[in-house]
């Protein structure tokens, strides 16, 4: 009798526990997205961002800068080891991060009329140890495309080729998981934009051969280690690049940037054809899409945020069409239209936008249905979490208008106050928001 009584109690308690674990109650969350989200939005250069931080600091999440190999490379050992001093780049990252922003970086060799290497116009950013080699010979154009004096890296030089690959290996090893860096843009030619407008293209001299370009793309895919990397949409041009005719390269998950976005002839013209050729309408699903508002006309940057649109198209329309995650618009605040509030609105028209459509808990677990109501996916890992307990399902890659079901091995509070999105890819000052209305 005593044994039977004990068994009865055990079964009764077990029944209560099973009943408890199967009782799911709604979590009455009420959240709003209040501003641009990390790794998205309109972008300023550091000088502009620094000067406008009081008024525009909350309107942006990203800043852009070119990065010069000659500023971080001190030399090369006899065994081929590149000697670096990253302090210049570290100062740049720290400056941007001090405003709660992340960097979009682009390495380049050529910049027509650029003086940021040595104060002289058009000097390449090739490291000095390569320039001092007897087998390295740069070429020069006095005014290609009307952009001013330009020197060109010597792509016949095998050490330049080797160094270029090694630079990205070493850079990605050091910075791929650094939260101060959001995205990396790469390429060749003027501004690394995959063209030499106004100058004659000479493979293996002023531009890398298609064979080396292929090697470079495959190398980037190998070393990026989760860091989203982008190339110019101009890489779709068969004159310069092998990409669109190479199935293996087209299958890589690189993103795209367009540095003359929304110019007068953009739609239906060369730029849109480039997007279609190299993007195929689906590249945005795995690769970040961004760029810079056009400088073709002085009004392009200053008026693209006009509610009436620019050349018949609004910013919101174009951001949606091309699934834009970020866009440089450094001169926009000087035009009168792009107030801090309008800049904030423009930033919020890009990227991802997470919405919790349903959330419930049984006290020990939480499950929710999450949708992306933005124009692009998130390209780096982030997770919903209850307290310190993360979901095993990353939000990375959730496409616009798609939903996913997420479970977390912890119980949410009744109001969901302990539910957040966490990511190792954002700064401590940043927070990925989500919207949720009481269910």
Q: Predicted regions span which residues?
A:
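Bacterial N-terminal signal peptides that target proteins for export
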Residues: 1-7
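Hydrophobic h-region of N-terminal signal peptides that target proteins for export
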Residues: 11-20
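N-terminal substrate-binding region of glycoside hydrolase catalytic domains
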Residues: 22-159, 282-320, 324-338
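Catalytic-core regions of glycoside hydrolase
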Residues: 24-51, 97-99, 183-333
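Conserved, mostly hydrophobic/aromatic
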Residues: 63, 96, 171, 184, ...
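Short catalytic/ligand-binding loop motif for oxyanion handling, primarily in non-cytosolic enzymes
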Residues: 71-74, 111-118, 125, 190-196, ...
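Active-site groove signature of glycoside hydrolases
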Residues: 136-160, 164-206
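Extracellular/luminal regions of secreted and cell-surface proteins that mediate adhesion/ECM remodeling
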Residues: 348-439
């Amino acid at each position: 009798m005593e044994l039977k009584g004990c068994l009865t109690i055990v079964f009764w308690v077990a029944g209560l526990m099973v009943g408890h674990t199967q009782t799911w109650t709604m979590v009455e969350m009420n959240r709003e997205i209040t501003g641009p989200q990390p790794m998205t939005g309109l972008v300023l250069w550091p000088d502009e961002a620094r000067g406008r931080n009081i008024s525009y600091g909350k309107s942006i999440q990203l800043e852009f800068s070119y990065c010069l190999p000659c500023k971080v490379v001190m030399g090369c050992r006899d065994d081929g080891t590149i000697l670096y001093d990253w302090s210049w780049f570290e100062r740049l990252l720290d400056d941007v991060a001090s405003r709660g922003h992340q960097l979009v970086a682009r390495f380049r060799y050529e910049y027509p009329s650029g003086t940021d290497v040595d104060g002289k116009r058009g000097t390449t950013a090739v490291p000095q140890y390569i320039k001092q080699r007897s087998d390295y010979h740069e070429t020069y154009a006095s005014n290609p495309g009307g952009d001013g004096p330009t020197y060109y890296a010597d792509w016949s030089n095998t050490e330049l080729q080797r160094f270029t690959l090694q630079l990205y290996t070493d850079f990605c090893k050091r910075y791929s998981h650094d939260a101060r860096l959001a995205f990396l843009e790469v390429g060749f030619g003027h501004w690394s934009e995959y063209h030499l407008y106004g100058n004659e293209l000479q493979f293996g001299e002023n531009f890398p051969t298609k064979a080396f370009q292929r090697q470079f793309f495959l190398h980037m895919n190998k070393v990026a280690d989760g860091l989203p990397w982008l190339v110019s949409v101009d890489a779709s041009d068969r004159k310069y690049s092998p990409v669109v005719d190479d199935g293996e390269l087209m299958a890589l998950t690189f993103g795209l940037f367009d540095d003359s976005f929304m110019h007068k002839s953009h739609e239906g013209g060369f730029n849109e054809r480039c997007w279609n050729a190299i993007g195929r309408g689906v590249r945005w699903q795995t690769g970040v899409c961004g760029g810079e508002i056009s400088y073709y006309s002085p009004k392009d940057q200053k008026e693209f945020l006009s509610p009436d649109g620019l050349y018949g198209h609004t910013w919101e329309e174009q951001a949606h069409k091309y699934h834009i995650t970020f866009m440089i618009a450094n001169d926009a605040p000087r035009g009168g239209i792009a107030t801090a509030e309008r800049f904030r609105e423009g930033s919020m028209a890009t990227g991802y936008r997470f919405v919790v459509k349903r959330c419930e808990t049984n006290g020990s677990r939480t499950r929710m249905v999450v949708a992306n109501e933005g124009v692009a996916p998130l390209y780096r890992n982030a997770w919903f979490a209850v307290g310190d307990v993360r979901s095993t399902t990353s939000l990375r890659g959730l496409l616009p208008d798609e939903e996913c079901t997420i479970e977390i091995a912890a119980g949410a509070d009744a109001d969901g106050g302990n539910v957040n999105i966490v990511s190792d890819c954002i700064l401590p000052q940043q927070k990925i928001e989500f919207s949720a209305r009481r269910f």
